[in-house]
Amino acid sequence: MQAYLDLMAHVRHHGTPKSDRTGTGTLSVFGHQMRFDLSRGFPVVTTKKLHLRSIIHELLWFLSGDSNIAYLKANGVSIWDEWADENGDLGPIYGVQWRSWPTPDGRRVDQLAQVLRDLREHPDSRRHLVSAWNVGELPNMALPPCHTLFQFYVAEGRLSCQLYQRSADIFLGLPFNIASYALLTHMVAQVCDLKPGEFIWTGGDCHLYTNHLEQADRQLQREPLPLPRLRLNPEVRDLFAFRYEDIALEGYQHHPPIKAPVAV
């Protein structure tokens, strides 16, 4: 994960000071890309410990099309608590848009199911896209999507995925996003009888919050460790049938965690 540390160092030393919605302040750069060859290990940050349970359960929650944090709370995941309303709801965020995008004539489009079908039937298509950025429903979302659009690409029997992320909280959020979409790529590859290829991350506003700078400096002093390997239950052939126990990361070596406040 040297590429991640390189981005962090670049923003730390060359980022432009900017104000932001939360009132915290950031150092920011605009436009950056990282590529991860999934055959060389699973791209999870090793220079601090990540809460893998949260990453896995959040992705399964997205895939279910849910927008209420009850499932997350039941599984010990609190990363969405600050944005939920008194009933635990977040509005039509990621999972709703992925699985139930509303159309003008009142229908609902399951973008993920459509992409899975097209990957199997038309792998060379250039239309394997899923978007969470529904302009008409942004006002009803607890938080507009930071990771907004992803596209799959098939070549020589390998599935790659590129994510466009409009806003990237480098210290806290980005390690989760990279691991989550790398996991999704592995899962989609398995159910489509493909091998994992690359995960390409493209960021818009890439920033470090000013109250994360000390933590970033500490992390930048640490040496990356070897990447772990992802193991999926090979019997799962339906993307929406994966459960937590079907997913395992083997050999995850990491440095100690580094705590930092969330900007809300």
From Swiss-Prot:
One of its GO terms (biological process) is methylation. HAMAP family: Thymidy_synth_bact (MF_00008). Homodimer. It is found in: Cytoplasm. Keywords: Cytoplasm, Methyltransferase, Nucleotide biosynthesis, Transferase. This is Thymidylate synthase. It comes from Alkalilimnicola ehrlichii (strain ATCC BAA-1101 / DSM 17681 / MLHE-1). Its main location: cytoplasm.
